[in-house]
Amino acid sequence: VETKELYYPQISAQAGSYTFEEGVELEIYSSKSSYYDWAKIRFTSQFRQKLSLKKKDPATIQLGYDGTLEDVFTGFVSGNYDGGTYANEVALKDEMLLMEETIINDTFLDTTPQELISYFLAQAGLSKMKLSSKTYPTRKMLPIRKQTAVQAINAVNAAWGLRVPFFFSGGVFYWDEKPEQKKVYTFERGVNILNLRRAGGVWELETVSAPFIKHSHKINLIHPQVSGEVEVSKVVSKTNDSGFIRTYIYF
């Protein structure tokens, strides 16, 4: 269990051929209940360059300290930004954008859920995946008609009577699996918890920039109101009014 000492936060946001290390505000949203993560790069008044970005240009947002940056978002620009217009923000979506744009139209014979999902990912040009190793019966026939790859995964879940989560994290597709967690971070009152409040049936913990916390991970809390290990349901990192990144962890 590790308590991170957090000083000198840094940011780096890349979209297409542009890299921003200042003059931008960020918002990054990642939740168990949403199958895709999204982010926004907003330009502050100093930055008024004309942007030329195309939908599906690659995008990465990194946060960190003392020169060590971690990916907090990987994905793509979610729309076209024409050089002739002043855009004050760029919207990004993770790899699920490619799945939403991939159409599946086929009848599948003698298949398992994992075989189908691997095929849908390949059709979207994606190969990094971690799929449940549980054994499911093969299905004699499953017709999928003009559905996006996301709808097709939902059709697979329904066909086998499964309610299992699927999402991308760090560019890897997970189906009924969780991203590996190398260490459990500790959040302690007076050390790295800026605020802890109960809102809408969940706890919201405000801390400084914490790019290493992902949804479905466990964290350890030392606080009079809550203590022990909890599982993270949502992580939102954004620039506050003073220009500092704050991470909000929900559980």
Label each region the model flagged.
Residues 2, 87-97, 130-199:
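Short beta-strand-centered interaction patches in the first periplasmic/extracellular domains
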Residues 59, 86, 174, 218-220, ...:
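A structural signal for the main folded, soluble domain(s) of proteins
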Residues 74, 114-118, 150-154, 213-217:
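Extracytoplasmic/secreted envelope proteins and their assembly/folding machinery
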Residues 75-83, 142, 231-242:
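Short, compositionally biased
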Residues 127, 163, 226:
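LysM (lysin motif) carbohydrate-binding repeats in extracellular/periplasmic proteins that recognize
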